[in-house]
Amino acid sequence: MRFTVKGKTEAADISGEVEAAVSHRIPVIGLYPAMENTVVLELLDKSGKVTDSQEITITTDELPDKLDDAVKPVKTSGESAFELTMVYGQRTTFPFAYDCMGDIRWYMSGEFTSGIYMLSNNRMIVASNEAFMPSQDKPQTTNLYEMDYLGRAYTMYYVAVEITMK
């Protein structure tokens, strides 16, 4: 099964695939905020050929106020090596990702100021700032979560000792 969120340009399309199954849950990411998004669902055979397809429309809410003008492209080629560019850290309290045209296509609704670390399996390690907050005795967060772009947590790590750089 393949999904494609249609972009404002063909280069801005975001696609992904899930393994064949009797029933599917499609993890659609890359929807534009505050608009009707067209998503193409394609059923693939074993060779990758499309056997059936369907278009659906998904309407989304507006971005949080803090993200309204977060990306201001001055000049863009309209192409990128990556479908989405992730932004987090510094003064960014809502981690977000934008496409080749500078449009925000994903954001994390919780405020995460402690850090996000991208993994090679399309997941991330998120440092929690909700519990066991850093203190003078323990300057870093103690809870880390491995999660995906949909916010599904897979593993929680508890850091019991202080991490120091030498």
PLM features: what roles do these ranges have?
Residues 12, 17-20:
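Short, conserved catalytic-motif segment at the N-terminal edge
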Residues 21-29, 36-166:
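Histidine-/acidic-rich catalytic cores in large beta-rich domains
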Residues 1-2, 92:
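Exposed beta-strand and adjacent loop surfaces of beta-rich binding modules
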Residues 2-13:
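Extracellular low-complexity, O-glycosylation-prone stalks/linkers
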